[in-house]
């Protein structure tokens, strides 16, 4: 088992564990330090604001009556299982894609923990530029976003395997 972890992308589970812990610690701080919808200004454009998200990204289906909690939890568990499978399948040297998978895994699990414990996701990172206010989010959301961006860049810039050259004269291609 140790050899599988060492040689595969499972070696990157440390990153998922650290990000999951950071997500949960910051959410714990939020619910212990702030009342619901209370804000603590850090900069004029950035605050910690305690909010509850009963839906998915941007509160999608947030007012659907409660069934969405189970749907989003099931989706996150399936995606997390698939990401662990991909990590196991990848070589440990595939750094960027393994990093992306680990970040997305940590974000999915961080929000699953909230949904299972509270029935909603705790959000607290609040950016207000005056002319535009971004929906409040959390460390787990940031990890998912960062992992997705890495995957996109990796798809554009990763070295592609060269096709196997067919011997000259072989027309059965």
Swiss-Prot record:
The active site is at residues 123, 141. Pathway: Protein modification; lipoprotein biosynthesis (signal peptide cleavage). Belongs to the peptidase A8 family. It comes from Psychromonas ingrahamii (strain DSM 17664 / CCUG 51855 / 37). The gene is lspA. Its main location: membrane. It is found in: Cell inner membrane. This protein specifically catalyzes the removal of signal peptides from prolipoproteins. One of its GO terms (molecular function) is aspartic-type endopeptidase activity. NCBIfam families: lspA. Its EC number is 3.4.23.36. This is Lipoprotein signal peptidase.
């Amino acid at each position: 088992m140790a050899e599988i972890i060492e040689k595969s992308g499972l070696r990157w589970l440390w990153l998922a564990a650290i990000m999951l812990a950071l997500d949960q610690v910051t959410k714990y701080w939020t619910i212990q330090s702030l009342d619901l919808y209370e804000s603590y200004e850090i900069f004029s454009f950035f605050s910690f604001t305690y909010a509850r998200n009963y839906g998915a990204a941007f509160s999608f289906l947030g007012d659907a009556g409660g069934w969405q909690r189970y749907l989003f939890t099931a989706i996150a568990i399936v995606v997390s299982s698939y990401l662990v499978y991909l990590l196991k399948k990848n070589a440990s040297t595939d750094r960027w894609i393994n990093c992306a998978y680990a970040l997305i895994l940590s974000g999915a699990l961080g929000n699953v923990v909230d949904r299972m414990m509270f029935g909603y996701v705790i959000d607290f990172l609040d950016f207000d530029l005056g002319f535009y206010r971004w929906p409040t989010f959390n460390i787990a959301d940031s990890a998912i976003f960062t992992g997705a961006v890495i995957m996109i860049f990796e798809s554009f810039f990763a070295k592609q395997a060269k096709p196997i050259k067919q011997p000259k004269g072989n027309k059965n291609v």
